[in-house]
Amino acid sequence: MEHSRQTMLSFLARLPEQEIVRSRDQGEWSVKDVLAHCVAWEAEATRRLQLVARGQGQRIHYYDDMREADRFNANAVRKARARGFSALVREAARVRQRLIKSLRRLPPRALQDPTHRFPVVAWLPEFAWIHEQAHLKEMRAWWSAQKPVWKPGSGVKRS
């Protein structure tokens, strides 16, 4: 989990700030919006882990309807747009650390506990690193398509 976040932040650190907040071709989300979306789901994962730790895993809300998930995403992006990118990066670090701390506090048996609708091992990888890496792959492809490429010997840059 720590590696996936560092990989994401290293990529973002190489982007010009104006590109981070500019809407991309994929939908209307900017790179900043995508990070806010990932951070919101990690905060949700942390909340779920805390419920599991308190023996209240049955209180976890699962987003079975994509409209619900879309509302969750839209709300996360809307809230983040009111803040600066640096503040969001700091929040991403805090949320990831809380997630790791919450996970480490769980006894190993809680990860596979069948009394919850879905055991932690069924949803945590998606919430914590698979999801982030999938978005990072999309953002890298988007950024590669934006950058001018210099071809040796051509004297011409293409975009």
Predicted segments, located by residue:
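Aromatic-acidic/polar surface patches that form glycan- and anion
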Residues: 1, 27, 88, 92, ...
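Long, hydrophobic N-terminal alpha-helical segment
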Residues: 1-3, 7-19, 26
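Residues that form generic nucleotide/phosphate-binding pockets
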Residues: 11, 52, 79, 91, ...
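Alpha-helical packing segments of well-folded alpha/beta enzyme cores
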Residues: 4-8, 41, 45, 88-99, ...
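Short acidic/polar alpha-helix capping motifs at helix-coil junctions
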Residues: 10-14, 63-65, 74-75
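Short, contiguous alpha-helical
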Residues: 21-71, 105-159
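Acidic/histidine-rich alpha-helical segments that form the ligand environment
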Residues: 4, 68-110
